[in-house]
């Protein structure tokens, strides 16, 4: 039996912790593969690295500085599915951990 893929959903996941992000992606993929036979692709996007330079001294000694960085890891899940299936109910069932931000785009 051939399944028609009428619609596509992109779920964009972002997190500062790459282990949380990978486990969240795997959790969503497992939920969707256990209930549906659709095609799911995980795309890894480049990590954004923000570096902040802070002076250690309050008013003098500009040579003494400290650098801090924040890395934002990103993934995109492309889900092709049949439009008759309630895909949003399955995605809301995923219960992602705090610290993982997600956006859902329909196309």
Swiss-Prot record:
InterPro entries: Ribosomal_uS10, Ribosomal_uS10_dom, Ribosomal_uS10_dom_sf. GO terms for molecular function: structural constituent of ribosome; tRNA binding. It comes from the Eukaryota. GO terms for cellular component: chloroplast; ribonucleoprotein complex; ribosome. The keyword Iron does not apply. GO terms for biological process: translation. It is found in: Plastid, Chloroplast. Its main location: plastid. Keywords: Chloroplast, Plastid, Ribonucleoprotein, Ribosomal protein. Gene3D superfamilies: Ribosomal protein S10 domain (3.30.70.600). NCBIfam families: PRK00596.1 (NF001861), rpsJ_bact (TIGR01049). Belongs to the universal ribosomal protein uS10 family. Involved in the binding of tRNA to the ribosomes. Part of the 30S ribosomal subunit. This is Small ribosomal subunit protein uS10c. The lineage of its organism: Eukaryota, Sar, Stramenopiles, Ochrophyta, Bacillariophyta. The gene is rps10.
């Amino acid at each position: 039996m051939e399944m028609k893929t009428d619609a596509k959903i992109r779920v964009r996941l972002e997190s500062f912790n790459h282990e949380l992000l990978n486990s969240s992606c795997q959790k969503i993929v497992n939920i969707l593969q256990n209930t549906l036979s659709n095609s799911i692709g995980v795309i890894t996007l480049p990590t954004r690295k923000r570096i902040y330079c802070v002076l250690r001294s309050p008013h003098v000694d500009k040579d003494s500085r400290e650098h801090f960085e924040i890395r934002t890891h990103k993934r995109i899940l492309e889900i092709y599915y049949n439009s008759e299936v309630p895909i949003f109910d399955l995605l809301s069932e995923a219960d992602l951990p705090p610290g993982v931000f997600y956006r859902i785009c329909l196309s």
